[in-house]
Amino acid sequence: MAVAIKKEKTKFAPVKEVLSEKDHANYTKFQDTSKLEWFCRTSNHKKFKSHSLLKAVRNPTETRIETQTLYFTDLTNGKCGLIQLLYSSVMGGIYKGFQLNFKIFKASSEENSEEDIDIWESFKIDNIKDFDTLKVESDNVTFHFVPLENSSSSGFAQLLIKIDIPKGSTSCLLKDLKVDITVNLQEGFIINPDGSNYYLDKSISLEELAKRDSSSTSRKMIRHVFVPRGFCNGTISYKKNDKPVKLDLKDTPMLYLDAVQGLIPNKAASKWNFLCFNGEKRSMMCIEFTTTKEYGSTTVTIWAVSDKDKILEVGSSVNDHAVKFPSTKEDKQNGWKYPTSISFPRGFEESNLRLVNRYDIMSELPAFIRSIAENLANMKPFIYQFCQKSKFDDDEGVSIIESTFIN
């Protein structure tokens, strides 16, 4: 009698692996703005003609969060930061809205303080006037992608960011926030088939997974689109404790990342690691996440190395656990052991991490999403953010590193 062999099954369909140059068909480089479109808007663009925020996205039952994030590192003065536009649609549209997250921090400090953050603020964005595939505009905030006719050393597109938060509309720590910058975007990439990792409702065999048909897709996903190198020009100004601060960005290197989560954060992943290194000659980025036990505790790692105008190397792995913590420190408040040194793929190491911020991940999200997640058991969501001068290969620059622990 033949013995039936039980086939191994999975409920998680990760992106493809890129382990060597022979895997070049497993990722796609791009130099067109179609990959930069708002995913939550684009997937329903044909259905809805209106630019109305509440009509632009249909009502799935799942929660969906999309972020467009610009990380920049000014190598001349060590000022670093991020500007993030966050869109969320919760539980089929019970809540929909935009939020702006803004952070500035330093790569070094003369003070003997472990935490040294310049500013961190979040703003709810009201009065959306335009929500199109490449543009979001409100009374106070504009994010707008503009294609360049001829791809060149200037890149294939520009991201225009304008922010004007009036005095008195925020906390007493930050006032009069004004941003007017132009970002020239160089070559981007996604990991195939479509940049998405899918969380399946039903288990499928590994043979079915390899086919990559409709059985291995879902509205529940994590999707990433990367532009690992570009340059910012413009100004950022604000008042901190009523003292004016102004940053003049001139060809400041940056990383752009579009991320979509089709699940609430504690369902999507149990932990994350992130690297953005920018030097005079090249950039290195990496993102790694581990799914929850329900989806096999699977670890997906994606990385890329770029020079000033093109991508030199792309990699991705599944369950290689490429990010390592050689040394850690326990946070007495929550029990998490966050890194004091860290290593990433491609030989990037930082042995002296400099903590600039520590906060609850839910504090970046709208209050409605936060209230849902905080009511669930085993939730201790903290992000540890580091910024320091670093070296990569023969280049010197600044690295922004994040380690996130959720449950």
Swiss-Prot record:
GO biological process, one term: response to oxidative stress
Subcellular location: Cytoplasm
A single cellular component GO annotation: cytoplasm
Keywords of this entry: Cytoplasm, Isopeptide bond, Ubl conjugation
Positions of crosslink type Glycyl lysine isopeptide (Lys-Gly) (interchain with G-Cter in ubiquitin): 22
Highest taxon, organism lineage: Eukaryota
Family: Belongs to the SVF1 family.
Other known facts: Present with 3990 molecules/cell in log phase SD medium.
Protein name: Uncharacterized SVF1-like protein YLR225C
